[in-house]
A protein has these predicted regions:
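Alpha-helical transmembrane-bundle signature of multi-pass membrane transport and export proteins
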Residues: 1-418
Length: 418
């Protein structure tokens, strides 16, 4: 865990760059072209790349060294941003769409590589704690990135924003390169052909041997729909609350959400350390229900204090479910883990991208509460169905998953206890 904390720091710095990049580039596209269509197309290209790169990333991390992939992904993003920074003004617009492909693909590759590597970096018994640290780091990076992006662009300009963004990726790549960590399991004596076959059939095998795990991935995809709905609806809702200061509620919401994430990391880390067991699929389904319900309550027009409390609960449940979900996928054998996280990334990005399009259209005719309730209500319904199936299957089985159940030599993914 000593080296992993440095890795979390580097990952948090690059995550800050990603969120700064997300805001600065979208605004730059609109300012440079004067076209909302061009800005929307830029976002669509990036989201589509995120979806496709999930499948590609799963293949890459199953074959190549993950540390090198993460370093390469950070360097590619830094070089792409520096190219945009140094390009003449007349060429920048054309480079933007190439940049959307590079940043979208590299960010997904980096995420899939890191999540697949955690059991090898820290050991399977420490994966829950490690996932919690990553969730906390990225939550803080998101708040810092969104909060500072406007200030950086307004006060320093786009060139400074792109330079700062590139610097964060260079720092992250340097930290990763220098850390003496192993990101892939030692090669087994059965040869690479068998390992490749195991990875190739992961998705098909999951349908037959781990339907609950596939259901969890489906829940995460629908959660992506819900997440996109409250992201799109939040500025509209905030403007309705205070037209003169719409950013006030947005800042309160995201700051409280981040605090909830940190609380979740602390709680689940202590519970796991004390009990020696990781909350399983049932806890995941229940936590996802609480998360979606919390987001719905935020948009119910409550006074500030109850709304902030709802955001805190939603943030805690969000962090809780993400830690459980990632930790559960990490119980898969190393040669299959990359494909599994690639599939998960594609599903989550598909849900989020589709939700951005649909919720944006629905908000033209319906209120923020109606749209958010519809999308998160769908997630709640799916989670309740999953919870019912788990309860029927589980009977009197223990609801936790022991950390020691990870078998590095296993050849198939099996269901854990929920």
């Amino acid at each position: 865990m000593r080296y992993f904390r440095l890795l979390v720091l580097g990952n948090g710095i690059s995550a800050y760059g990603s969120y700064l990049n997300m805001v600065a580039l979208n605004v730059f596209v609109y300012d440079a072209t004067g076209s909302a269509l061009a800005a929307g197309l830029f976002m669509a290209v990036r989201l589509a790349t995120n979806v496709v790169s999930g499948w590609v990333s799963g293949r890459l991390v199953s074959v190549y060294d993950r540390k090198r992939l993460m370093v390469g992904a950070d360097l590619c993003q830094a070089l792409a941003l520096l190219s945009l920074l140094l390009a003449p003004d007349g060429m920048r617009v054309g480079l933007l769409y190439a940049l959307a492909v590079i940043t979208g693909g590299c960010s997904t590759l980096s995420q899939v590589s890191l999540r697949s590597s955690i059991p090898e970096i820290v050991g399977a018994e420490h994966r829950v704690r490690a996932n919690g640290l990553l969730v906390t780091g990225r939550s803080l990076a998101m708040i810092a990135g969104f909060a500072s992006s406007g200030l950086v662009v307004v006060k320093l300009g786009y060139s400074a924003a792109f330079a700062l963004d590139a610097a964060t990726f260079l720092v992250s790549a340097t930290v990763l390169f220098l850390l003496p960590v192993r990101t892939k399991a030692a090669a087994a004596g059965t040869g690479s052909a068998e390992s490749s076959d195991a990875a190739r059939w992961t998705a098909r095998m999951l349908l037959g041997t781990a339907p609950v795990l596939m259901a969890m991935i489906a829940v995460r995809a629908v959660d992506g729909l819900g997440s996109s709905s409250h992201n799109v609806a939040l500025p509209i809702y905030s403007s309705g609350l205070d037209p003169d200061h719409p950013a006030t509620f947005i800042s309160q919401f995201w700051a409280t959400w981040a605090i909830g994430n940190i609380v979740a990391q602390q709680v689940i880390g202590r519970v796991t350390k004390k009990s020696g067991r990781t909350p399983g699929e049932r806890a995941f389904a229940l936590g996802a229900c609480v998360m979606s319900a919390g987001f719905i309550v935020v948009f119910c027009g409550l006074p500030t204090v109850p709304a902030v409390i709802a955001a805190l609960i939603a943030g805690a449940a969000d962090g809780f479910t993400e830690i459980i979900y990632v930790s559960r996928l990490q119980t898969a054998p190393d040669e299959q883990r990359g494909r599994l996280f690639g599939l998960s990334a594609s599903a989550e990005n598909t849900g989020f991208g589709l939700g951005m399009l649909v919720s944006g259209a629905l908000l033209e005719a319906f209120s923020p509460l109606q749209v958010v309730a519809a999308f998160h209500g769908l997630a709640i319904a799916l989670c309740l169905a999953l919870l019912l199936v788990l309860l029927r299957r589980g009977g009197t089985r223990d609801p936790g998953v022991e950390d020691k159940t990870v078998d590095r030599d296993a050849s198939t993914v099996t269901e854990g206890r929920g």
